[in-house]
Amino acid sequence: MLNFFAAAPKGFEYSLAQELTEFGATEIKESVAGVYFTAPLALAYRITLWTRLASRIVLVIYKGPCESAEQLYNAAYCIDWSSHFSNRNTFSIDFHGTGGFINNTQFGALKIKDAIVDRFRDDGDARPNVARIDADIKIDAHFRNGVITIAMNFSGPSLHQRGYRSTTGEAPLKENLAANMLVRSGWKAAPTTLLDPFCGSGTVLIEAALMAADIAPGLQRSRFGFEHWRRHDKATWHEILEEAKARASLGVKRCDVKFYGSDIDSRLVALAKRNAQNAGVLELIDFKVANALNVEPPAGEGYLITNPPYGERLGSVSELLQLYYQLGDKFKKEFGGWKVAMLCSDIELISALKLKADKQMKMFNGALECAFNLYTLHAQSTRRDTPVLPEGVDIADIAPAFANRIKKNAKQLEKWAKKEGIDSYRLYDADIPEYNVAVDRYLDHIVVQEYMAPASIPEAVTKRRLSDVLLALPAAIGVDPHKITMKTRERQKGTNQYQKLDERKLELITTEYGAKFKLNLTGYLDTGLFLDHRLTRRLVGQKSKGRRVLNLFSYTGSASVHAALGGAKSVTTVDMSNTYLAWAKENFALNDLSGKQYEFVQADCLQWIRDSALDKSAQYDLIFIDPPTFSNSKRMEDSFDVQRDHVNLLGMLIKLLSPNGEIVFSNNKRKFKMDTETLAKMKIKVENIDDLTLPMDYKRNPHIHNTWLITHA
């Protein structure tokens, strides 16, 4: 009997142990990401050829305590390596694990390599050569908790590589993961009609067909690790291989299970057909190009096993939620009597099915943790003759309070916005506390920003509520799901405003009181335009005619554009970010504004103010400043707190202000308190103008910002 370890992805251990038991292996013991077992050589060959779940089979040569480099060397040296491979063979060592005396895996691999070549030399043979790539013999060593395991890779390249895949589609499913889905769903134990409406490159269906047709998954592999092993029994291996070929030929002819696969992408369907042809099972599978929502259930009952899309891409969440909701509705109404098994990495998406799972399991698709849920669709939920739900499905049972509120808001604001001459505005701002989001309309696009929930609310609850919001939105306000962008907003921490979110760009041009601005709905946390400052920007424009205007912490320069369009004599735009200054220049160009009177300055605004305050010639007639509530950017020398530092800030700004000049000072600190007493002593006059600067779409949230008009006393 020989000792082996079958490696597999995390979560496969139970299924793999069951498979090894069915093969007839003994002394089976589950471990992390694999299973130990013993088997005679012939059975080990059979397991290597027939396992559908293992990623790798290794022959365990030595396992024992190891507490020093000397013990590691001795453990490897005591093995009779010449009985395993010839010195004419090349070898390599994969070492895993650190701790104690092993600081890095390279050290461990080097010790074992030295022991192997020394043993060959001491036995009177020339040393074998090490090959980093494509070695004849691959040694696997694992060090964990003071125990060293030295093994030989028996199976060769990863066993999930069956040999039938020509190329991969986007986000391919590994073959042994597909096989485990078939095992854990219960389908393998009783093969019956199988449907995959998101078949992609066909992996689930091909693996199922291989099972039903009694085809060994390793039959098309061109290479195995034991081929250069000195104890390899070629005759026994040939016999097992020929038996598998005969079973495959007979199995395809006898297979009466029906397989159906479809995908909306014709290129993937063509690829699935090629893969099935390579695997020898194309004649068993009916592939077609189709939208999953239009796929009819085959006659009778069966299994629907699939790995639907669960994009990690920002902005696709709402569209996917709609898809999952409509799938759940379709399953309930058209697939009565069927069993459904679905792999998905996103709990929000799979919960949007609105189906109660019989069983929930955890699987890993590579490093991605996924839920694998099983559902039984009761027979009384029979097929209906009405068409499938359209994209803007009425889902009044989902978040009705939110849906009714935003529908009402949208109706009121649409006419107002048209009259105002704006096409970007806020529709909803956590009006109902349970639905803690802000919803903004930018032309025909919607941006949903999730506020951070209190720690007292369970994460599962907040996720479900957000999911319901995204499901309800399209029908409530008549927007296409793919035009909904999702963002998560937290309490501002220093440089959050400047953090890039996504390489993709969804850019639009919005109009505001005649001014045009570029928006980027996906690139950053903010879109390029603070909607709550709309009236403040217009006020700046109205006050700018013939004046020298300074815009500090300018962001994308929207207030500067209003000033220029308002007839400013000059406009100086200052911001720390080159990215946003470039954006500001684009906004000027959009409005056909150019000339030397428009200056753009990249600088730490606080330091720029300090330096300019010393320059008696630097005078401005109108200053607009909207500083961050708090900032500790690496590019700014000091931290800034608007409550703590506003007196000092305004004291410096007043030195830049002409005798009849005005400062429009705004910030977003909700409990901001202006120190009017100290400022009065400094001969600075302060007037709150919140009533003039709060737009109608923000009346529900009057504390969104506070704005002040400041002059010389």
Curated annotation (Swiss-Prot):
Gene assigned in the entry: rlmL
Family: Belongs to the methyltransferase superfamily. RlmKL family.
InterPro entries listed in its UniProt record: 23SrRNA_methyltr_KL (IPR017244), RlmKL-like_Mtase (IPR000241), RlmKL-like_Mtase_CS (IPR053943), RlmL_1st (IPR054170), SAM-dep_methyl-trfase (IPR019614), SAM-dependent_MTases_sf (IPR029063), THUMP_dom (IPR004114)
Keyword vocabulary terms for this entry: Cytoplasm, Methyltransferase, RNA-binding, rRNA processing, S-adenosyl-L-methionine, Transferase
GO MF, one annotated term: rRNA (guanine-N7-)-methyltransferase activity
Keyword Transferase: yes
Compartments it resides in: Cytoplasm
Entry keyword Membrane: no
Function: Specifically methylates the guanine in position 2445 (m2G2445) and the guanine in position 2069 (m7G2069) of 23S rRNA.
Species annotation: Shewanella sp. (strain MR-4)
Entry GO terms, CC: cytoplasm
HAMAP family reported in the protein's UniProt record: 23SrRNA_methyltr_KL
CDD domains given in the database record: AdoMet_MTases, THUMP_AdoMetMT
Reactions performed catalytically: guanosine(2445) in 23S rRNA + S-adenosyl-L-methionine = N(2)-methylguanosine(2445) in 23S rRNA + S-adenosyl-L-homocysteine + H(+); guanosine(2069) in 23S rRNA + S-adenosyl-L-methionine = N(2)-methylguanosine(2069) in 23S rRNA + S-adenosyl-L-homocysteine + H(+)
Protein name: Ribosomal RNA large subunit methyltransferase K/L
EC number, as in UniProt: 2.1.1.173, 2.1.1.264
UniProt enzyme class: transferase
Domain THUMP: 43-154
